[in-house]
Amino acid sequence: MVALRLIPCLDVANGRVVKGVNFVGLRDAGDPVELACRYSREGADELVFLDIAASHEARATLVEIVRRTAESVTIPFTVGGGISSIEGITELLRAGADKISLNSSAVKDPGLVSRGACQFGSQCIVVAIDAKRRLEESSGWDVFVNGGRKNTGLDALSWARKVVELGAGEILLTSMDGDGTQKGYDLELTKTISQSVQVPVIASGGAGCLEDVFEAFEYGNASAALLASLLHDQDLTIEEIKNYLLKKNLIIRPTNY
């Protein structure tokens, strides 16, 4: 069995890491490269950078952050946010990113997923899905884009299956209801998607304690857990989380590996 992964998430705006609750109320959380180095030293398995500004000016800043990070850490990292072309993918991969995350651009142009997978390999293409539980009594989740501001009307499960067919090698699944709340991952959402696709699913949105991370793996069937507030606020370290999961008999790469 492949080892389960812990992945710190760095939301970047104007060259700084920021964090909010339910996609709003952003606050400064530090320098992205410094945090990347810290998490790498602590034993993170991978990193994710998401450019939430995604403007033309911000892109140059992001490319520089990617270059500096690639020079400073040896663990794989994914970059996403406003990437809408093969040229954009190429630029960030050349700067040192290992994977590219597509979100709104995949909904607008699904062919970008298949073109990216064809040119760079499925292992390079991650599709990020921001899902929000429907208010009606009917079950299911809607896919949102544009930083969680626009409901596409797409069903999250159907969309997850579609992007895998198109060539996505991984899904970054964020529960908008749980994002930044530290009240636990949406286990039903995570399990539903994880059991329905044949690629790894990264659980995102809501980790607040050790038990939450364990449950994402044990009950949500996630392949990886994305962590933000829990680490940025230094409530827990990656080593503490990994030691806890190892005691729970999960297959995790030790921090002293």
Swiss-Prot record:
One GO term of the cellular component aspect?
Answer: cytoplasm
Record-annotated active site: D11, D130
Concerning CDD domains, the annotation shows: HisF
For the keyword Lyase, the answer is yes
Among the Pfam families in the record, one is His_biosynth
Question: Where is the protein localized?
Answer: Cytoplasm
Matching Gene3D superfamilies, A to Z?
A: Aldolase class I (3.20.20.70)
Does Transit peptide appear among the keywords?
Answer: no
| GO terms classed as biological process | L-histidine biosynthetic process
Main localization category: cytoplasm
Q: Which GO terms describe its molecular function?
A: imidazoleglycerol-phosphate synthase activity; lyase activity
- Tell me the keywords, alphabetical order: Amino-acid biosynthesis, Cytoplasm, Histidine biosynthesis, Lyase
Q: Which pathway, metabolic or otherwise, does it act in?
A: Amino-acid biosynthesis; L-histidine biosynthesis; L-histidine from 5-phospho-alpha-D-ribose 1-diphosphate: step 5/9
Task: Write out the catalysed reaction.
Answer: 5-[(5-phospho-1-deoxy-D-ribulos-1-ylimino)methylamino]-1-(5-phospho-beta-D-ribosyl)imidazole-4-carboxamide + L-glutamine = D-erythro-1-(imidazol-4-yl)glycerol 3-phosphate + 5-amino-1-(5-phospho-beta-D-ribosyl)imidazole-4-carboxamide + L-glutamate + H(+)
Q: What is its EC number?
A: 4.3.2.10
| Protein family per UniProt | Belongs to the HisA/HisF family.
How does it associate, per the subunit comment?
A: Heterodimer of HisH and HisF.
Which HAMAP family does the record associate with it? HisF
| Record function comment | IGPS catalyzes the conversion of PRFAR and glutamine to IGP, AICAR and glutamate. The HisF subunit catalyzes the cyclization activity that produces IGP and AICAR from PRFAR using the ammonia provided by the HisH subunit.
The name this protein goes by in its record: Imidazole glycerol phosphate synthase subunit HisF
The record lists the organism as Prochlorococcus marinus (strain SARG / CCMP1375 / SS120)
